């Protein structure tokens, strides 16, 4: 079989507790864009148990087809049954492109799927485009610690596979009038691949809001001087109903945990308002927040890239300005 025999864009529609993970909708949105360039449809692959009703939601966000594999062995995610089911779908339908979210599940599942279908995988992509010359998929990701961007091709094998970071791509507006063809598939031998028994699922209680969910992000950089000074950023975030984030140097210095990092080697965010306090604006950081609706930068250096990228720039010491701003907003919003 030649690579010309592979057709279509497939996305993994991840669900947990019968709730579709947001990145799944983002993959469909990007998949529609890619599919338009190569003249095909987008198929969402939905695995689980009792999940058939979720097909309409995937259709509303743009899926042209939804392949549903519904089985008791897929009720809770475990590696082998999910990998076996997805490999079976690939072998039957021969998609040209397969997209997974770069979530804990996607990162566990995608490399195993790619190995079993003997193709490559580009992980943590921040950009996907169709090459106008040969219609191949150009997959771009950070390399060398985020210092360069590498564009990777999979010209000799199919499907072309990538994991995509949550928040990088945009989902389409929901349209409940859009319907998809729903195909119910049965995968043989799932029980033979159950080698882990899940006894209990204990969910962690998040102490802070996920930065990708926040409408207002107050982000600090090396210019904040110390981890203790992030308390003033928390105060500002609390006034506005948001949460705090940071640039990579703050994580490298141990000031904040990795899940607070914005940028190419952290998370991509799109809040309504993004405060950049003491952040110079390295290209790696800008790539993770440049699509925020409003960017407000506070920096001593008026020539800092972050000031240039901001909708509103305040030139001055963030350690002095942030407390004043917090008090002013408290009075305004009281």
Q: Where do the language-model regions lie?
A:
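N-terminal glycine-rich FAD/FM-binding segment characteristic of electron-transfer flavoproteins
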Residues: 1-334
